[in-house]
Amino acid sequence: MIDVPRTLAPAAGVATRYSLVPPRGGNPLWSTAVALAPVAGADGAEVPLSALVAGANGHSRADALLRGAGEAVERRALHPDDRLGTVRGTAAGLGRPALAAHDPRNALAHPDSARAELDWYPATRLSDAATVLVPAPLVDWPATAPGSLFDPGPSGAASGGSAGMALRSALVEIVERDAFTTAWGRRLRLPCWTDPFAAAAGTPDRPTGEALRALWRRAADAGVRTVFARIPTAVDGLCCVVACLLEPERPGALVTVGMKASDRPHDALLGALQEAWQVRAALEATLLDGPVADVPDPLVTEHDRIRYMLTARARRAVRDWAGGFVPAPAPMTAAEVTTDGIVTALLADGADPHVVDLTPRLPATVAAMGWRAVKVVPAGYQHLRMDETHEWSWNRSRLASAPERTGCPARLTDHRAAAPHPLP
């Protein structure tokens, strides 16, 4: 049985310490921060912060703590080691089926990766349950391969109290990332609402409704405008929601975006709004070190993107996108979506997800509680880009088909004209 305090205890091997902070200042959410066990064999000074620390915000103490524990287990499982059945070689020399990550239809690696000697992990291809090798840099965080060949990151990984829960969460995340990145790259005119309770039919459960109303009103009381939008996806019944917190323009104003997909629309609205508040808190924390200057261009790291989000250029880009949203003709409705249904819809939409079981990397005590972790490599879909220097990491077919797939007109014809996306 999942035991959150035991999961986060140093003896379990996931974390060295953690903190739980109640709402304070301008942050209306509970916050959990978890210092992860060190990355074996890595110089801590060169490890990205998100591989050293896991964090999560929630509308309640229990929500923040559970989210923080799940995030910590997921990030710990991404730390590279040799427990996944590593194979070393070039794609041509493996003698086994391997994912062509460099194929433009996947856009997950530089073309030179096709000839590079890499570590590979076995994955299950969901289309036929075949075992296929995938490049380790598409799984590990931090990655050890040259940054010029891949655009690694933690997206597509998830943990849960069962293998099925972890897989579902990871699949939903790759849907979110594909939907958001292509919608941003084409500046789609998304259907939107300013009132979250007009955005979803029916009545939410009491905790969800109270939390959603409290966060929405908190923004209004602070003079921050809230806009919710839906990105249509191939998965019928899955509500993919974007929430924008738009502070009036002034020096030092904060503008943030969050997103969440769920077959329960009120949960999607709450999750997206929580994430927008969480990003806002991260920006406020960054400002404690003083005004931001010398933001790298192009952006390469997650830290670069957080700093970029404090610039007037970033604020203008988000305001411009939200300004192009159109009133939604009807509210979202709840509809049960099964994991099998998600997989079927993804395959029909051109995705070819490959699943790597990360559970062997979890400490025995944690796995014995029931924790499971996976990473879904989103072949065929647009991944969440981190390094803006990689032109090859745009999935051009997904960008080209976005208006037709979603039914949302595009304001940009060339994705290269889009500003960097606002999801740190």
Would you name each region that the model predicts?
Residues 1-424:
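Helix-biased "structured C-terminal domain" signature
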